[in-house]
């Protein structure tokens, strides 16, 4: 077959394979067009799950008669005109493919009228060449798009449609997501002539909470923490549920970037990391989060459906979201009674995002002026706060004001006792020593179950036999056997690393600011040299009871730094060794699943240990006696 140009209808049908997956995809594209047109009310009528009819009616600015013929043409749009527009997208649509693709696989009719026109006009495309026909019609200011008999000319696609109930459920979910993104817009959803969803315009915070409650449920609102978190040109707002309100499936996770609903791995990973040890792998967080940033810093031209985006500074976005959500969850653990009074002006000094300035050229839009630019400005104004629940709104400064962190109280010693009890029975003397070890595990120097003399280990090698339940190494030396707890080995590695004369440091992308109370400030004055010796770098402002963390030891980069610092300042440490012990006891440890990783950890610790300090490693060993099983 020679090379030839595809007919317009076939080319549009190929494009429709990416854009129009099911009736819900049509609803998404058409509603986004209505939003770009500046509509304040949108009505969505569905028949037979969208297979028979999808009708979207809005009160936007409408389309002029002379533009109607191009409205159904491929790659025709009024929202961008050059590469600069594409790199700073604020409108939801910009590709100019949706209407052409939908009309190629359905019977599409578009009726519209602008305020300047005395009458409305209707356009539809038909035939192999997708020729358009325009005729007068009766219609108020705004636009109505009717999509009838979806996939009527592509039977292979139509047979993949699910039941009417399933397809409408997908449409309902799309409308819910858009309604959360645009609370100021009123939405009405009908199915087979019956009104099923009606969301009124929400401007005030109480009205927005009602919409969130209608979509996510009252239980979510009662267990939600409100976030308003800023840093330079980044702004994170919305709600995250407390860890106890976890979900068995990922059905209450809504994230938006510049008002666009997206599914992004960076955002999801950051939120998941913020929850950390609060949730198991089978539990999912619930959240509704809005991220606003300079449109030049995000690429939305990744996929025709525009569900995916790429951040130019993905690591910065990840850390910003992780820190904002993490601080909100930690604040939830604090005593809310201490924050009933409104935040004072001096508590809020983070600069507001300013990228919506006149320096940024707005997108060209079918509606003319892009209404979402000014709307975003309004959203960004306000203080950085966290709030809990709908009945009572508590304010939290982003200055980490006296945050009381929540840490897991899992006892390593209990885990070890269970491990050793299930694996084998040790002699009475060893059991007694293990009990002593459980009581004194907060100090590395006292982690001794069966005391070992360094001379007994010198000149002989310990052979690694197995990894026991991913929690301990089973070692052999001649006829003697030992268990080496990996949790204690990791803590020893952290302590030895922080004792090195030249500690590798890493600057924070987003410095962490702490607002201290009197007791914490007094402890800071006593312990700041300990922080400096351990590789931390702060800027301090004692007059305002504030310190700012700028650099951290590289080995602690992935740790809960704000929680560690506050916890350390809640305690009194007279010596650097006590300080390091307390710090290392708070760190999140890695799970080790293979023997090779355990041996790597052991090798790293041995390299950090000086010859005269080998006793520190020997003190972690727990003697195991197999004699009674051989008799």
UniProtKB/Swiss-Prot annotation:
One of its GO terms (cellular component) is mismatch repair complex. Signal peptide: none annotated. InterPro entries: DNA_mismatch_repair_CS, DNA_mismatch_repair_MutL, DNA_mismatch_S5_2-like, HATPase_C_sf, MutL/Mlh/PMS, MutL/Mlh/Pms-like, MutL_C, MutL_C_dimsub. PROSITE patterns: DNA_MISMATCH_REPAIR_1. CDD domains: HATPase_MutL-MLH-PMS-like (cd16926), MutL_Trans_MutL (cd03482). GO terms for biological process: mismatch repair. Keywords: DNA damage, DNA repair. GO terms for molecular function: ATP binding; ATP hydrolysis activity; ATP-dependent DNA damage sensor activity; mismatched DNA binding. NCBIfam families: mutl, PRK00095.1-1. This protein is involved in the repair of mismatches in DNA. It is required for dam-dependent methyl-directed DNA mismatch repair. May act as a 'molecular matchmaker', a protein that promotes the formation of a stable complex between two or more DNA-binding proteins in an ATP-dependent manner without itself being part of a final effector complex. Belongs to the DNA mismatch repair MutL/HexB family. PANTHER family: DNA MISMATCH REPAIR PROTEIN MLH, PMS, MUTL, DNA MISMATCH REPAIR PROTEIN MLH1. HAMAP family: DNA_mis_repair. This is DNA mismatch repair protein MutL. It comes from Mannheimia succiniciproducens (strain KCTC 0769BP / MBEL55E). The gene is mutL.
């Amino acid at each position: 077959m020679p090379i030839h140009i595809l007919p317009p209808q076939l080319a549009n049908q190929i494009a429709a394979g990416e854009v129009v997956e099911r009736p819900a995809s049509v609803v998404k594209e058409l509603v986004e067009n209505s939003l770009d047109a500046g509509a304040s009310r949108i009505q969505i009528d569905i028949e037979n799950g969208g297979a028979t009819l999808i009708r979207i009616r809005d009160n936007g600015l409408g389309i002029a008669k002379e533009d109607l013929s191009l409205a159904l043409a491929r790659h025709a749009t009024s929202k961008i005109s050059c590469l600069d527009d594409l790199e700073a997208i604020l409108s939801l649509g910009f590709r100019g493919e949706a209407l052409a693709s939908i009309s190629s696989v359905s019977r599409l009719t578009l009726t519209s009228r602008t305020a300047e026109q005395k009458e409305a006009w209707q356009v539809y495309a038909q035939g192999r060449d997708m020729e358009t026909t325009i005729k007068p019609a009766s219609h108020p200011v705004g636009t109505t798009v009717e999509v009838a008999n979806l996939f009527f000319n592509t039977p292979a696609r139509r047979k993949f449609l699910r039941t009417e109930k399933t397809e409408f459920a997908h449409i309902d979910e799309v409308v819910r997501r858009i309604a959360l993104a645009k609370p100021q817009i009123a939405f009405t959803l009908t199915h087979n002539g019956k009104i099923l969803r009606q969301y009124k315009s929400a401007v005030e915070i109480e009205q927005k909470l009602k919409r969130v409650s209608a979509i996510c449920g009252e239980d979510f609102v009662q267990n939600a923490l409100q976030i308003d978190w800023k840093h330079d040109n980044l702004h994170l707002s919305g709600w995250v549920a407390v860890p106890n309100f976890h979900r068995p499936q990922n059905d209450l996770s809504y994230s938006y970037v510049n008002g666009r609903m997206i599914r992004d791995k960076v955002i999801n990973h950051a939120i998941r990391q913020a929850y950390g040890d609060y949730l198991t792998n089978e539990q999912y967080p619930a959240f509704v989060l809005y991220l606003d940033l300079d449109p030049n810093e995000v690429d939305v031209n990744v996929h025709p459906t525009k569900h995916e985006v790429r951040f130019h500074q993905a690591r910065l976005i990840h850390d910003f979201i992780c820190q904002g959500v993490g601080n909100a969850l930690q604040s939830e653990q604090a005593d809310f009674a201490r924050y009933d009074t409104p935040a004072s002006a001096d508590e809020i000094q983070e600069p507001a995002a300013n990228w919506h300035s006149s320096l940024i050229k707005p997108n060209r839009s079918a509606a003319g002026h892009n209404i979402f630019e000014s709307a975003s400005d309004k959203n960004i104004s306000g203080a950085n706060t966290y709030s809990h629940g709908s009945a009572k709104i508590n304010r939290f400064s982003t200055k980490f004001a006296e945050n009381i962190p929540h840490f897991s109280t899992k006892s390593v010693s209990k885990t070890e006792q269970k491990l050793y009890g299930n694996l084998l029975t040790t002699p009475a003397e060893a059991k007694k020593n293990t009990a002593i070890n459980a009581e004194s595990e907060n100090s590395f120097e006292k982690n001794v179950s069966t005391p070992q003399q360094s001379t007994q280990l010198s000149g002989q090698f310990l052979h690694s036999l197995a990894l026991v339940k991913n929690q301990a190494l089973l070692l052999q030396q001649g006829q003697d056997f030992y268990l080496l707890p990996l949790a204690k080995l990791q803590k020893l590695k952290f302590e030895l690393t922080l004792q090195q004369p030249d500690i590798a440091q890493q600057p924070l992308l987003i410095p962490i600011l702490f607002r201290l109370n009197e007791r914490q400030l007094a402890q800071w004055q006593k312990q700041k040299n300990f922080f400096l010796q351990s590789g931390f770098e702060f800027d301090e402002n004692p007059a305002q009871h504030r310190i700012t963390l700028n650099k951290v030891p590289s080995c602690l980069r992935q740790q809960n730094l704000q929680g560690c610092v506050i916890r350390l300042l809640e305690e009194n440490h007279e010596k650097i060794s006590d300080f390091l012990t307390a710090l290392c006891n708070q760190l999140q440890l890695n799970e080790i699943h293979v023997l090779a990783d355990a041996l790597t950890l052991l090798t790293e610790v041995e390299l950090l240990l000086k010859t005269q300090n080998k006793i520190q490693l020997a003190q972690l060993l727990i003697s195991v006696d197999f004699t009674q099983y051989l008799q």
